[in-house]
């Protein structure tokens, strides 16, 4: 029961609880987005490091056709692997949230 225009405890608590859930969800979404950016950055760094080491023995002004083909194949391999891992990860998250 409210006296003199002050909200009752149950209404106030319900609103606070709803706001807390909304804030919690926003924080979770922000963390998820930050993790996605960090993962993408890590992927690019790993691809660059590993494919360069594998394909370019002596750096020059540019890549020769053999090095270019090697880098492209390496990149495609990493991207295929990334897609498989990402799909599996998303599936697991969806299963655990249900």
From Swiss-Prot:
Disulfide links within the chain: 51-74, 55-70
Localization terms from the record: Mitochondrion inner membrane
Primary location recorded for the protein, binned into one broad class: mitochondrion
One Gene Ontology biological process: protein insertion into mitochondrial inner membrane
Presence of the UniProt keyword Signal in the record: no
Domain of life: Eukaryota
Pfam families: zf-Tim10_DDP
Region of interest called Disordered, as start-end residue ranges on this chain: 1-24
Topological relation to the membrane, as annotated: Peripheral membrane protein
InterPro entries, per database record: Tim10-like, Tim10-like_dom_sf
Motif Twin CX3C motif per record, residues: 51-74
Keywords tagged on the record: Chaperone, Disulfide bond, Membrane, Metal-binding, Mitochondrion, Mitochondrion inner membrane, Protein transport, Translocation, Transport, Zinc
Gene Ontology CC terms: mitochondrial inner membrane; mitochondrial intermembrane space protein transporter complex
One GO molecular-function entry: protein transporter activity
Subunit composition and interactions: Heterohexamer; composed of 3 copies of TIM8 and 3 copies of TIM13, named soluble 70 kDa complex. Associates with the TIM22 complex, whose core is composed of TIM22 and TIM54. Interacts with the transmembrane regions of multi-pass transmembrane proteins in transit.
Family membership: Belongs to the small Tim family.
Task of the protein: Mitochondrial intermembrane chaperone that participates in the import and insertion of some multi-pass transmembrane proteins into the mitochondrial inner membrane. Also required for the transfer of beta-barrel precursors from the TOM complex to the sorting and assembly machinery (SAM complex) of the outer membrane. Acts as a chaperone-like protein that protects the hydrophobic precursors from aggregation and guide them through the mitochondrial intermembrane space.
Entry's free-text remark on domains: The twin CX3C motif contains 4 conserved Cys residues that form 2 disulfide bonds in the mitochondrial intermembrane space. However, during the transit of TIM13 from cytoplasm into mitochondrion, the Cys residues probably coordinate zinc, thereby preventing folding and allowing its transfer across mitochondrial outer membrane.
Protein name stated in the entry: Mitochondrial import inner membrane translocase subunit TIM13
Organism: Debaryomyces hansenii (strain ATCC 36239 / CBS 767 / BCRC 21394 / JCM 1990 / NBRC 0083 / IGC 2968)
